[in-house]
């Protein structure tokens, strides 16, 4: 099971809520997708000659397939929700379909682009970002927004039941019904969640990203008011992409 979509859309909050269920493991940003991709590039690239010469190509394929099992080897929950914004990219979905029998299911979080940009600008300002806090945020195929944006666009036009799209405001304002939709989509037995005592069981070290507070959540659900003014150029760009 995957958790993907745009950044600043409540993925940490959603993971914390789902993790209240002992049968669900949902942690922070996962390396599984990147590890599988890198191994695939090796098996069908730099290591191909050796694998074929020694009749070990099947071994290489097994290595790719077993990366999720190794990554989550200490997890006892029956369902793992792997969080990575790259799961909506076509090559990564093709990789899931190639190596696993079951049809992949991916939760895709969305939010108006202008709100995402405001959130990142506020985060940069809080971390004393040196330079223009709007700099590079909407550059073509850039991280962390535009690469994810392209993935979400692709998922929307190629959805054959693999993707469940979730709006940020629905997660905040219609939490119970949104969680119920997720359980139905994932074909999981229902669970009574506590939306007034939310704890992040798997906190990330935001120093690695250079953005302290990036994955902070509060024990109750509410939308933070941001006193952020964007430039006219940025507002226009957000509107043109929406």
Regions found by a protein language model. Give the residues of each.
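A structural signal for well-ordered alpha-helical scaffolds and beta->alpha junctions
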Residues: 11, 61, 89, 93, ...
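Short, well-ordered alpha-helix to beta-strand connector turns
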Residues: 21, 77-78
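Pocket-edge structural micro-motifs
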Residues: 28, 83-84, 230
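PAPS-dependent sulfotransferase catalytic domain
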Residues: 79-193, 208-214
């Amino acid at each position: 099971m995957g958790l993907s979509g745009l950044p600043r859309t409540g993925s940490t909050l959603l993971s914390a809520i789902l993790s209240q269920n002992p049968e669900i493991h949902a942690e922070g940003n996962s390396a599984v997708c990147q590890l599988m991709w890198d191994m695939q590039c090796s098996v069908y690239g730099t290591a191909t000659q050796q694998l074929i010469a020694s009749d070990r190509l099947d071994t290489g394929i097994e290595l790719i397939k077993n990366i999720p099992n190794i990554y989550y080897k200490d997890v006892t929950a029956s369902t793992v929700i792997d969080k990575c914004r790259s799961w909506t990219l076509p090559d990564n979905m093709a990789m899931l379909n190639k190596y696993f029998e079951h049809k992949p299911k991916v939760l895709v979080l969305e939010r108006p682009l202008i709100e995402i940009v405001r959130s990142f600008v506020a985060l940069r300002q809080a971390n004393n970002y040196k330079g223009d806090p709007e700099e590079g945020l909407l550059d073509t195929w850039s991280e962390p927004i535009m690469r994810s944006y392209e993935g979400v666009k692709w998922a929307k036009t190629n959805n054959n039941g693999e993707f469940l799209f979730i709006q940020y405001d629905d997660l905040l304002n219609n939490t119970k019904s949104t969680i119920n939709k997720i359980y139905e989509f994932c074909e999981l037995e229902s669970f009574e969640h506590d939306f007034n005592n939310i704890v992040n069981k798997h906190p990330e070290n935001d120093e690695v990203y250079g953005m302290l507070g990036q994955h902070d959540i509060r024990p109750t659900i509410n939308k933070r008011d941001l006193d952020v003014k964007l430039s006219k150029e940025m507002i226009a760009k957000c509107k043109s992409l929406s």
